[in-house]
């Protein structure tokens, strides 16, 4: 199930390389139209477009294709939930189930709905092991003491923000929080922090 950005392309390439049969559902106004062309190039079982509110249609497409495991790849702008989404009955029931409208609650409710229809929602990084950062220092230069202090401070702040389910990204400098992710997404908070 594809949102925006390069992540869906990476997942598609990796899953195909591993020999998986794929049915791709692109979210209209989110997923890149090039994803349909790439899917055709890989001779996938099928490619379908749904609007953000068509969870029932998405489930119908997947169950008809015999899908028992699905993953979501790519961002879906949360602001879209508050403007112009026309939810189908399945989406309405799913939104009603979510106690809040933050990311964790929404994804959990969607996962539960998929599960009720025999579709397990799997980790979006399942096929991307070689592309994920390994634990530890990623540069050839050791961190300074000030950078280590910022890193520890940043970890504690990010952990606190994540517990509140506000976002997953923060930027810090000299033990001050410069920017916190909210609904605008990771890329936007990084760009904003760079401007500050």
For the regions a language model picked out, list residue spans one by one:
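Short beta-strand segments
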Residues: 1, 25-26, 70-74, 172-173
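N-terminal basic/disordered segments at the start of proteins
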Residues: 1-27, 53
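Short glycine-rich anion-binding loops that position phosphate/pyrophosphate groups of nucleotides
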Residues: 4, 75-78, 176
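Short amphipathic alpha-helices and their capping/turn segments at secondary-structure boundaries
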Residues: 12, 58-68, 190-196
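Conserved mixed alpha/beta catalytic, RNA-binding, or beta-rich assembly cores of soluble enzyme
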Residues: 15, 120, 124-196
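Short coil/turn connectors at secondary-structure junctions
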Residues: 18-21, 44, 65-68, 116-119, ...
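N-terminal beta-loop-helix "entrance" segment that forms/cooperates
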Residues: 26-51
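N-terminal glycine-rich phosphate/adenylate-binding segment common to multiple enzyme folds
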Residues: 55-128
């Amino acid at each position: 199930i594809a949102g925006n950005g390069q992540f869906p392309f990476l997942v598609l390439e990796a899953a195909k390389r591993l020999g998986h049969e794929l049915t791709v559902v692109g979210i209209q106004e989110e997923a890149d139209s090039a994803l349909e062309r790439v899917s055709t190039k890989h001779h996938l079982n099928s490619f379908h477009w749904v609007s953000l509110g068509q969870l029932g249609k998405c489930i119908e497409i997947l169950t008809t294709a015999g899908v028992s495991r699905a993953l979501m790849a790519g961002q879906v702008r949360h602001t879209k939930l508050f403007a112009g989404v026309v939810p189908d009955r399945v989406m309405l029931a799913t939104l009603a189930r979510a106690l809040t409208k933050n990311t964790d609650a929404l994804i959990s409710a969607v996962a539960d709905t998929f599960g009720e229809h025999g579709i397990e929602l799997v980790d979006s990084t399942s096929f991307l092991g070689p592309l994920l950062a390994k634990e530890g220092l990623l540069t050839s230069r050791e961190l300074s003491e000030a950078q280590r202090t910022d890193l520890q401070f940043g970890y504690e702040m990010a952990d606190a923000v994540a517990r509140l389910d506000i976002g997953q990204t923060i930027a810090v400098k000299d033990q001050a929080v410069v920017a916190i992710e909210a609904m605008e997404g990771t890329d936007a908070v990084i760009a904003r922090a760079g401007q500050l």
